[in-house]
Curated annotation (Swiss-Prot):
Binds a Zn(2+) ion per subunit. Belongs to the helicase family. RecQ subfamily. Residues 705-872 form the Helicase C-terminal domain. The lineage of its organism: Eukaryota, Metazoa, Chordata, Craniata, Vertebrata. Gene3D superfamilies: 1.10.10.1460, P-loop containing nucleotide triphosphate hydrolases, Zinc finger, CCHC-type. Interacts with UBR1 and UBR2. Interacts with MCM10; this interaction regulates RECQL4 unwinding activity. Interacts with TOPBP1. This is ATP-dependent DNA helicase Q4. It is found in: Cytoplasm; Nucleus. Residues 86-100, 114-137, 248-262, 306-320 have a biased composition (Polar residues). An ATP-dependent DNA helicase which unwinds dsDNA with a 3'-overhang in a 3'-5' direction. May play a role in development of the palate and the limbs. May modulate chromosome segregation.
């Protein structure tokens, strides 16, 4: 039988492949034309079927001989005729009476059976129990293809054990006779009449020849045996004639209700066992095709059991099968039990739920409950829509409350197994061509077809017309003189005159000219966008967008605006109600200035939390202001990549043509990069520079113990009396208990001022590991003067508007000159003297920490290549015409380089890159991957276009089964296209759930992603509800797996992909080298003017030393244009490079030890070097590898690239 199942499975696999290839089932001629191996399988299948049939015939003859031998066997009798073996006779030997005649004397035979039962007594019941136990050993019918074995003669003899002669007890015959009289009087004549009517209806059923009289559901007529639902005897008889069926109702009804109830539980167990066997079909389940049956020369198909075939006169249509199932249900009714006197007991219906609570409502609560129920019933009459049907508390069939689908009496859409299979056969899955014709989209296609039409090009949203300037510039672009209207607006804002640089910048914005303004911290940069916004709003309803980097900075900017200027902010930290209120005011043109984060601006139209709506829903935008514009050049790389797309989104989606950039620190190279983003053509003039105010006194020292030096400095005369101090250091240093040491040491120093005049607290921490409420509390306490010192990271202080900050201290080297200038610029804004000091480590530990961040953003060429392969997968669009000119090699991202324009046959496809899987595959952070994608979007060739993030996978589950899924596909084009694009592998069994890619489906259909998502969401609700309220369909639709969403071409050549890889890798390498060069240059500059210790800085500041530091910083910002020539000279020999030879042997041993301890990991040279430097990555997190201090941060003082080179050599030697 195992070989038969194997051969059947292979033949069915060949037939399915033939059907997919030719669109039809194979015929006899196709089988003869098949390969020799296939024909040999058909011949072997025929021989195996014949062998199985012969074995079944021998088994049937053996059973008949055993039955005849049992009839002829004579038993010694001394108790009368009640010991005869008539009850053990086979049902096949019963007299063949007509079904109609048996109905007429139904009651007579029932009484006769009851009388015989009385005569036989307990002996007959014992025989029946033994016979039941013996017959239970006969194998039940198994599904096709299952392994069966014919019983041997010995087992057949054991199936009929000899029954020992029982000894009757005295008085038992009289008890049985009395019980007979009671049971005869309890018979209901109406019940006999109903039985007569039911059996008469049975004669009218066209498919009655194949009925199953068991309590199970009607199964397809696969075998010629019928299971008799006898509670005491379970046997299988061959259906030979209608007369044999006429005997079965009498046997069913001849048992007492008590016996039926007592055996019901065991009967259920047997049925579960049979169902469990049937629920495990073999790989060859299912009939062969018609051509295959013709090939086997009239033999049974392999999907049917090897039983005696019964001629079925019934029709094979769905209507006949439904009538057959209805006819079967009449015979499943159990007889009515006799009325019994149960005394003080009642019957509980456990199928219906009854809720009885201890604390039931009484009195006022009960009257209120009744009042609510009454008005719920009147709700429809008063215009209400009734309770809304949900998926949790309503029936999936009828949509009513109070019951589940299993107790529903109304016919629902759910089908039986047979009807569901018939519907699957009658309703095949639509092809892609049919779906395209039905939906009107000609772009539904397979991903592997060569004739696939190109996907439609991504349409850019219509940009609104830009606003005209308030004061148009002259013919040569000159700015007009400042009119009196501008000065009047200045007075309305509370100012009397302009500060240096403000007037020129404001007039350029009012003339519609993009401007980059660089002013020191506290010089009034906010006025440069407030005044133009007010004047534009006075002329016509419009909006001014301000892009701000921090949420706390947004709140401060809104609160500091004058009352005549209406402003609001929009970010992800707001509640849904707050966002809706702000958007409502913006649409109504009640807001003059809208402050948003770059993430909210880039994700406009994505309907995410804190995202900005589309430009069509907003008033005309006068101009856009980007505060802290240096973030476009510094923060945009691997930290906040959305900054790279801010100007592109404003220009292409919002229609903005005038930009204003505000910053306090911008070198020459940073200014050129920012000007390129803002679209400032030609030479630009920096209004102001990063000049350090004269009231700041700077000093630098290199102390061996920086903690003790800080305490000594704060206890000195120079810093002892200062009330507001900001101390910048790393987060690790704050969390290592250093803050407690600072509080303890400073509390022991007495304060000469009177009680109540100074701050209440000494020092508090501020870093990203704290909650937002705690950070806000610390900042407010510092702003109100209740806190003397704030020990924080570099995130604190941006947008801080406290003019009397008296001191700023740095524990360690700052990240850059720009960061240092911004930090010290927060002190002394009131013009009074302020002090700033920098502590450096003499051994360079602070420089080592900063180098870690530069190396963390770099990646390998192999990771870049994998990303390019994921972004530009090949498509089947027709090839482009070959251009005569060859593409030039991409070297740098410069707008001056020209590229040949080639004819494009592929207009691009929408793709989704799952974030989590992409991060793990490339071992890169989300920000680093998005940065590389932004590089490709901003490239002159425009390799791709980034879209808002989306959920790529859709999981759809139908509670109604595969029939409901097929019905929904006819009214939902995306679902039909999904089934046609990804057909199920096994079509014999229906499926009720689907999981597919939404972006890929939308691209193949040519639809927008939003339309596809909306169509799938509509499947959860009934389009034609029976009531006024919306009703659920029982369909669950869930979107998951957040992914990068982009639009890219699929016809790039290998040369173009190599150019993209080189371009991205060169950009990453250039950023890393530039960051390292700046760090070394800054470290060298500060070391040249640093004191060996803080001793000279304790009492008073050194003016000469302060001027040296100021000159050094100003030189960096003014002479930045020579950076490219001096970068290699400035970098010089790398620190730690000369010590590598002394550590080489130890490094190699540690690499080998690391590889042996973790053989399951696939390390790379960069991964090993990151572990030695303490750099976490997605595949090698610090929470796991940071626990092993034998390797983590062990070689931080050595060069990163040298470690990576040694690790790569060891990996190659070990073959990994």
């Amino acid at each position: 039988m195992e070989r038969l199942a194997t051969v059947r499975a292979r033949l069915q696999e060949w037939e399915r492949a033939f059907a997919r290839l030719h669109g039809r089932r194979p015929a006899k001629g196709d089988v003869e034309a098949a390969p020799e191996e296939t024909r040999a399988l058909y011949r072997e299948y025929r021989n195996l079927k014949q062998a199985v049939r012969q074995a079944d015939d021998r088994h049937r003859v053996l059973e008949q001989s055993l039955a005849e031998a049992a009839e002829e066997a004579q038993e010694p009798s001394c108790w009368g005729p009640h010991l005869s073996r008539a009850a053990t006779q086979n049902t096949q030997s019963m007299p063949k009476q007509s079904l109609l005649s048996s109905v007429q004397d139904y009651g007579k035979r029932l009484k006769a059976n009851l009388k015989n039962t009385t005569q036989t007594g307990p002996t007959q019941s014992r025989k029946l129990q033994l016979q039941k136990r013996s017959l239970s050993t006969v194998p039940a019918p198994r599904p096709p293809g299952s392994k069966t074995e014919s019983p041997c003669p010995d087992e057949a003899d054991d199936a009929l054990p000899r029954v020992p002669e029982p000894r009757p007890r005295l008085g038992q015959l009289q008890q049985l006779r009395s019980s007979l009289s009671r049971r005869l009087t309890s018979l209901d004549p109406g019940w006999l009449e109903r039985c007569h009517n039911r059996v008469s209806d049975l004669l009218e059923v066209p498919g009655a020849c194949g009925l199953d009289l068991s309590a199970e559901e009607s199964q397809p007529q696969m075998s010629g045996k019928v299971n008799i639902a006898d509670p005491d005897i379970q046997s299988e008889v061959s259906v030979q004639s209608p007369e044999a069926i006429a005997q079965q109702p009498a046997q069913v009804l001849s048992q007492s209700p008590k016996s039926i109830n007592s055996k019901g539980r065991k009967r259920k167990w047997n049925e579960k066992g049979e169902d469990f066997a049937q629920d495990q079909p073999s790989s060859g389940a299912g009939p062969l095709s018609e051509g295959a049956r013709a090939t086997v020369h009239g033999q049974d198909p392999p999907g049917e059991p090897t039983q005696v075939n019964v001629p079925q006169p019934c029709n094979s249509s769905n209507q006949a099968r439904t009538e057959k199932a209805k006819g079967t249900t009449h015979l499943h009714a159990s007889p009515r039990p006799a009325s019994l006197d149960r005394g003080n007991y009642i019957r509980l219906n456990m199928k219906n739920k009854r809720f009885v609570r201890v604390g039931a409502n009484r009195g006022r609560l009960l009257r209120k409950q009744v009042w609510k129920q009454k008005w719920k019933k009147k709700q429809a009459a008063f215009g209400g829509s009734g309770p809304r049907a949900t998926d949790k508390d309503t029936c999936f069939r009828c949509g009513q409350f109070g019951h589940w689908a299993s107790q529903c009496s109304q016919p629902g859409p759910t089908l039986t197994v047979q009807e569901e299979g018939d519907r699957d056969d009658k309703q095949p899955i639509s092809t892609l061509e049919e779906v395209a014709q039905r939906t009107g989209t000609a772009s539904c296609h397979h991903s592997g077809e060569e004739t696939q039409p190109a996907a439609p090009e991504l349409q850019v949203p219509h940009c609104p017309t830009p606003m005209s300037p308030l004061y148009p510039p002259g013919p040569l672009g000159q700015v007009a003189e400042t009119p009196a209207e501008v000065f009047q607006a200045l007075e309305r804002l509370g100012y009397r005159a302009f500060r240096p640089g403000q007037e020129r910048a404001i007039m350029r914005i009012l003339s519609g000219i993009s401007t980059l303004l660089v002013l020191p911290t506290g010089a009034g940069k906010s006025l440069c966008y407030q005044l133009p916004a007010l004047l534009y709003a006075q002329r016509s309803p419009c909006l001014t967008l301000v892009v701000s980097p921090l949420l706390s900075l947004m709140d401060d900017q809104v609160s500091d605006l004058p009352s005549c200027l209406k402003a609001a902010c929009l970010h992800s930290g707001m509640t849904k109600k707050q966002r809706e209120s702000v958007l409502k005011k913006v649409r109504a043109a009640q807001v003059h200035v809208l402050i948003v984060s770059p993430e909210a601006l880039v994700g406009c139209g994505a309907r995410g939390p804190g995202s900005l709506p589309q430009a069509a829903q907003l008033p005309p935008i006068a101009f856009a202001c980007i505060d802290e514009v240096h973030c476009l050049s510094q923060w945009s790389h691997n930290f906040r990549p959305c900054y790279l797309r801010v100007c592109k989104v404003l220009r292409e989606h919002m229609g903005v043509r005038c930009f204003l950039g505000l910053t306090a620190t911008a070198t020459r190279s940073t200014a050129r990069d920012v000007a390129q983003h803002l679209g400032i053509a030609g030479e630009f003039e920096l209004s102001g520079s990063a000049n350090i105010p004269a009231n700041l006194h700077l000093s630098v020292s290199m102390d061996r113990d920086s903690d003790q030096a800080l305490v000594t400095l704060l206890q000195g005369d120079r810093f002892r009396t200062l009330d507001s101090v900001i101390i910048y250091c790393t987060r690790e240093r704050i969390q290592n208990g250093w803050l407690a040491l600072l509080r303890t040491c400073l509390s022991m120093v007495g304060d000469s001022r009177p009680r109540g005049c100074g701050p209440e607290a000494i020092a508090e921490a501020y870093h990203a590991g704290m909650s937002s409420q705690e950070r806000r509390r610390v900042q407010q306490a510092f702003m109100r003067g209740h806190l003397r010192m704030v020990v924080a990271t570099v995130a604190f202080g941006m947008g801080l508007d406290r003019p009397d900050v008296r001191a700023v201290l740095h524990l360690g080297l700052p990240p850059s000159f720009e960061s240092y200038v911004q930090a010290i610029g927060r002190a002394g804004r009131d013009g009074k003297p302020a002090h700033c000091h920098l502590f450096m480590h003499p051994q360079g530990e602070d420089l080592w920490e900063l180098r870690r961040h530069a190396h963390a953003d770099s990646t390998d060429f192999l990771a870049v290549k994998r990303l390019v392969q994921r972004v530009f997968p090949p498509c089947t669009c027709s090839q482009r015409p070959v251009s005569k000119s060859s593409p030039e090699e991409v070297k740098e991202h410069s707008g001056q380089q020209t590229y040949p324009v080639l004819g494009q046959a592929c207009l691009g496809h929408e793709r989704a890159l799952p974030v989590q899987s992409t991060v793990q595959a490339l071992d890169m952070t989300e920000e680093a991957i998005e940065t590389l994608l932004c590089y490709l979007e901003l490239h002159p060739r425009h390799w791709l276009e980034l879209l808002p993030w989306t959920y790529a996978q859709c999981h759809l589950h139908c509670l109604g089964g595969s029939a409901q899924l097929q019905a929904l596909a006819h009214r939902c084009p995306p679902l039909a296209a999904c089934q046609a694009k990804w057909p199920p592998k096994d079509t014999s069994q229906g499926r009720s759930s689907l999981e597919f890619g939404v972006v890929e489906l939308a691209d193949s259909m040519g639809w927008k992603l939003a339309s596809v998502r909306q169509a799938l969401h509509q499947l959860k609700w009934d389009p034609e509800p029976k009531k006024g309220a919306a009703q659920g369909t029982g369909v669950l639709v869930k979107f998951s797996e957040l992914a990068f969403h982009l639009h890219s071409r699929g016809d790039l050549t290998d040369e173009e992909k190599d150019q993209i890889c080189d371009f991205l890798y060169n950009r990453v390498q250039a950023r890393e080298h530039k960051a390292l060069a700046h760090l070394h240059q800054m470290s060298k500059a500060f070391r040249s003017v640093a004191f060996p210790s803080c001793g000279p800085c304790l009492e008073q500041s050194n003016e000469e030393h302060s001027n040296q530091v100021k000159t050094l910083v100003s030189y960096y910002f003014e002479e930045e244009e020579e950076e490219e020539e001096t970068m290699t000279d400035t970098q010089g020999p790398k620190p730690g490079q000369t010590q590598l030879q002394d550590w080489e042997d130890q490094i190699r041993r540690d690499v080998r030890q690391l590889l042996s301890l973790r053989p399951e990991e696939r390390f790379s040279g960069r991964a090993v070097a990151r572990i030695f430097h303490g750099i976490a990555s997605p595949c090698y997190p610090a929470q796991v590898y940071g626990l092993d201090r034998r390797f983590w941060r062990k070689y931080l003082h050595l060069d990163f690239h040298a470690l990576m080179h040694l690790a790569t050599e060891e990996l190659l030697l070990r073959g990994r």
